[in-house]
Amino acid sequence: MTERKIALITGGSRGIGLGCALELAKAGCDIIINDICDAEKAQPAIDEIKACGVNAYFYSFDVSSYDAVKENVDKMIAEHGKIDILLNNAGITRDGLFLRMDMPQWESVIKVNLTSAFCVTNAVIKYMSKARQGAIINMSSIVGRHGNAGQANYSASKAGLIGFTQTLAKEFGSRNIRVNAVCPGFIQTAMTAELGNIDEYLKAIPMKRLGTVEDIAKVVKFLALDTEYVTGQAIEVAGGLMI
């Protein structure tokens, strides 16, 4: 019997993170989800993942804290033996026009969206290197490629993830570790529900609909499990927006 792969997903208790967890679970992966919430709030996500017939585990810690990440990743390895797949999905927005943006708005977004990817990847990739295999997916955004008014902090953090992805792909390709990014466009989540006039956004999307969490999850599953020769890519999943 083939040993199950184990996937770690940050920000995995809801939204895109949970959708990706479920997609990987349906493909037979055991799932470790991280979030900043407590175990009680994460339990519905754990139950939903377990219903796919796999094991699911929850670890609550701040992904932007280097020490907390190292402690918890070491604990995961001790308890589960390995991490085959890492999805750096944790992220926040603190939008505002640049002239009105203050330092806390800037720093909080960079810390959660970009610094966390460094912290978690730094802890996990050491084990992947020893195993000489692994798949890392960073959840970027279409605005990391093209920018967006009112999102200087968010756009910068997501652009940083693309550079981070390409650099690690070059550094770790010889160790059979693939590193890619996914760049969602407008996806039906609680975050985009706050945007207001969706019809205006739909005018710019050739496919004339918002994306779904499942649209993103299928690409993540492809990068994690279905390809062995794709690395260093930032794949836009945006219905043709920006072409």
Ranges and model annotations:
Residues 97-98, 105-110, 201:
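Substrate-binding pocket helix/loop in short-chain dehydrogenase/reductase
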Residues 118, 212-237, 242:
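C-terminal substrate-recognition "lid" of short-chain dehydrogenase/reductases
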Residues 121, 157, 165:
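Active-site helix of classical SDR
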